[in-house]
């Protein structure tokens, strides 16, 4: 490593997933960091603690399958790159079928401890209002989807472009000892065994047709929070409130988060449930479970009454009820360059959900890239962006090149947040077994395997050329 003792520090604004990962990558490369986090000086509607990298929605990092799932590929690439977020997630995983879910408190405490202990990282608890001052020099802004209005307004003034927004929602969490396990049972869908799992990682609450129809009707009629001042703000499609899905049609939920496929009632194996509500373990002790796909904007009074209609949850005690918050993000394809710098002020780099990516893993990955791009600049190195064939590159390409969709207005374009998915990757030739033509599901799986294998091979090559070691010790 080159001598970095005379380097001026990089300021990172925001101690969420992206900011924490960016700070770690910088420090591991030998670049001093000042990490600014406004909590506990100023809280948000969604955060409950002052820990860094607090998970405010689900505790799931989604699929850990690096062979046939794009987010699993991103997990693998981040591990290759020495990600702090992935190391702490792996160290604090809880059973969740094929998904990587974490004990949210243990996870954020581990991230906080690693950053506090790093000799090149200084954590400052203060709110940064508006854009960071010019005298700070190189700065990464990773203020997250709950970016304070003053900063959003400053960005608008700097760029002349409006920030964009969408709604995101939080699902309720239930105390395990209040769940009636004479009605519910443990099982992962199709008995799938995932990281740290057994194939029996979810609690399943069955409904017959009559119970389901009454439940859907109650959701549609329930008292909902009014957001008049945010009227016109769209929902992120991957995080629709449960009652909004119910309003789309009576069968929507049983083909979505309440689908009964791959599940057999342990108490009554011969009777197929019409719909199933799944609960996922939320902490390492197994004392808390969250309602999968049940993010909601129902008022608290309505939530408790309606969710207790679910068989097995008649006496449920809620550790946290569901909620809704407004997420702010940039029109990144217009405002940012290919390495996440603000075109109108190149000393500013943005990272995380404020750039228009969606999801814990994606936010962390963009923080990782922002940290590495910035470290290379500070060290006088040249760093080419990751190839578009990698999950890193596909996600970065969506944000900065823009998965830009034309709407009804000629010449007008819109940029929408998106999770990483194989649709963002360039096509790949699928190897054909001798004398066999692949069709249907077999062809789809083969294509995903080919995309994944190419991504990981190209990512290894990119990281090998990088010249920045990860230096990551196992998380505790």
Curated annotation (Swiss-Prot):
Enzyme Commission number, as recorded: 2.1.1.74
Signal peptide extent: none
GO terms for cellular component: cytosol
Tagged with keyword tRNA processing: yes
Substrates-to-products reaction catalysed: uridine(54) in tRNA + (6R)-5,10-methylene-5,6,7,8-tetrahydrofolate + NADH + H(+) = 5-methyluridine(54) in tRNA + (6S)-5,6,7,8-tetrahydrofolate + NAD(+); uridine(54) in tRNA + (6R)-5,10-methylene-5,6,7,8-tetrahydrofolate + NADPH + H(+) = 5-methyluridine(54) in tRNA + (6S)-5,6,7,8-tetrahydrofolate + NADP(+)
A Gene Ontology molecular function term of the record: flavin adenine dinucleotide binding
Keywords: Cytoplasm, FAD, Flavoprotein, Methyltransferase, NAD, NADP, Transferase, tRNA processing
Essential cofactor(s): FAD
Superkingdom in the source lineage: Bacteria
The keyword Cytoplasm is annotated on this UniProt entry: yes
Ligand binding (FAD): 14-19
GO biological process: tRNA methylation; tRNA wobble uridine modification
Subcellular location: Cytoplasm
Family the entry assigns: Belongs to the MnmG family. TrmFO subfamily.
Function as written in the Swiss-Prot or TrEMBL entry: Catalyzes the folate-dependent formation of 5-methyl-uridine at position 54 (M-5-U54) in all tRNAs.
Protein name: Methylenetetrahydrofolate--tRNA-(uracil-5-)-methyltransferase TrmFO
